[in-house]
UniProtKB/Swiss-Prot annotation:
TM segment ranges: 33-53, 77-98, 113-133, 178-198, 226-246, 288-308, 320-340, 347-367
Native source organism of the sequence: Globicephala melas
Source species taxonomy: Eukaryota, Metazoa, Chordata, Craniata, Vertebrata
Family membership noted in the UniProt record: Belongs to the cytochrome b family.
One GO term describing the cellular component: mitochondrial inner membrane
Secreted listed as a keyword: no
Binding site for heme b b566: 97, 196
The protein's name in its UniProt record: Cytochrome b
Superkingdom of the organism of origin: Eukaryota
GO molecular function: metal ion binding; ubiquinol-cytochrome-c reductase activity
Length: 379
């Protein structure tokens, strides 16, 4: 008799995705981040749902409703900090996942990669509108500054900003619609994740060597289910440590002050996971130029497959490309640091140099070095 998991229409989908899926035998722990992102998404949706039961998206009560969740709701403080720090964990996993794809050439699965870039943009949008909801000082001014960037668009800019605000400033209408966006976007993300997996399972996973994976495949269960459970336990351990010992480590103290349109914080800055893009934005004195650089810093990922000049897919056997890859990581960390600093000397020039290096590495240096490495293959 055939097993039910191989015949039942629903069970068959689960079986082909998580149980009998042929998987390369040599994928490393860098391939764990996909499942960790799935775990983060489920966790964020669940904690977010419980927070939404007590939150009120109204300018007069939003801040107090968050205080009420932390003080009066059973384990409300825990749910709130799990949700806030869960977002940080989400982005750590997301950046590790993208970094792994860049290093091992997984971007050559173009459909999977493009859906992934779309996912990144959607997650960033969700995190941005979510940060506005507690209605603290940084929520209000962050929303004002970032939405204001759209006014740099010629001709329609100002109208567009006022349309997004639902008025002439960030106010009640803005908060209400941002809550609506923050509620709906995770479900759009979930749908995109399904499409992402659909495209991935058309080709199968890449592997560290960058050679065809068909040579040596093993079933996903039990080999990679147990490996993913270990990754999940480590992620949960890290998240709980952060949430229970230093819940405000990654937050901004200004957000414990209720939003006040008449008082501007000394340093307006987004959450840490947007600081690298924020630093690139600030490095260009021209408003429109800054906005374009900000967009390009993320959208440049779409062009990565077109910039592949190497005959080898993975960087595993390409020491010069490896050097440039880790230089890029160091550059992104530098930009993240600069994004959190005030706009003054020497941070301005360091930020500008790091921004130039970021685009130079991706668009010029890495493709050029790959061509040189192709020549070295003949030695």
């Amino acid at each position: 008799m055939t097993n039910i998991r191989k015949t039942h229409p629903l069970m068959k989908i689960i079986n082909d995705t998580f149980i009998d899926l042929p998987t390369p035998s040599n994928i490393s722990s860098w391939w764990n981040f996909g499942s960790l992102l799935g775990l983060c998404l489920i966790m964020q949706i669940l904690t977010g749902l419980f927070l939404a039961m007590h939150y009120t998206p109204d300018t007069s009560t939003a801040f107090s409703s968050v205080a009420h969740i932390c003080r009066d709701v059973n384990y409300g403080w825990f749910i709130r900090y799990l949700h806030a720090n869960g977002a940080s964990m989400f982005f750590i996993c997301l950046y590790a996942h993208i970094g792994r794809s860049l290093y091992y050439g997984s971007y050559m699965f173009q459909e999977t990669w493009n859906i992934g870039v779309l996912l990144l943009l959607t997650v960033m949008a969700t995190a941005f509108v979510g940060y506005v909801l507690p209605w603290g000082q940084m929520s209000f001014w962050g929303a004002t500054v970032i939405t204001n960037l759209l006014s740099a668009i010629p001709y329609i800019g100002t109208t567009l900003v006022e349309w997004i605000w639902g008025g002439f400033s960030v106010d009640k209408a803005t908060l209400t619609r941002f809550f609506a966006f923050h509620f709906i976007l995770p479900f759009i993300i979930t749908t995109l994740v399904a499409v992402h997996l659909l495209f991935l399972h058309e080709t199968g996973s890449n592997n560290p060597m960058g050679i065809p994976s068909n040579m040596d495949m093993i079933p996903f269960h039990p080999y990679y289910t147990i490996k993913d459970i270990l990754g999940a336990l480590l992620l949960i351990l890290a998240l709980l440590t952060l949430t229970l010992f230093t819940p405000d480590l990654l937050g901004d103290p200004d957000n414990y002050t209720p939003a006040n349109p008449l008082s501007t914080p000394a340093h307006i800055k987004p959450e840490w996971y947007f600081l690298f893009a924020y630093a690139i934005l600030r490095s260009i004195p021209n408003k429109l130029g800054g906005v374009l650089a900000l967009l390009l810093s993320i959208l440049i990922l779409i062009f990565i497959p077109m910039l592949q000049t190497s005959k080898q897919r993975s960087m595993m056997f390409r020491p010069f490309s490896q050097l440039l890859f880790w230089t890029l990581i160091a550059d992104l960390l530098t930009l993240t640091w600069i994004g959190g600093q005030p706009v003054e000397h020497p941070y301005i020039i360091v930020g500008q140099l790091a921004s130039i290096l970021y685009f130079l590495l991706i668009l010029v240096l890495m493709p050029t070095v790959s061509l040189i490495e192709n020549k070295l293959l003949k030695w």
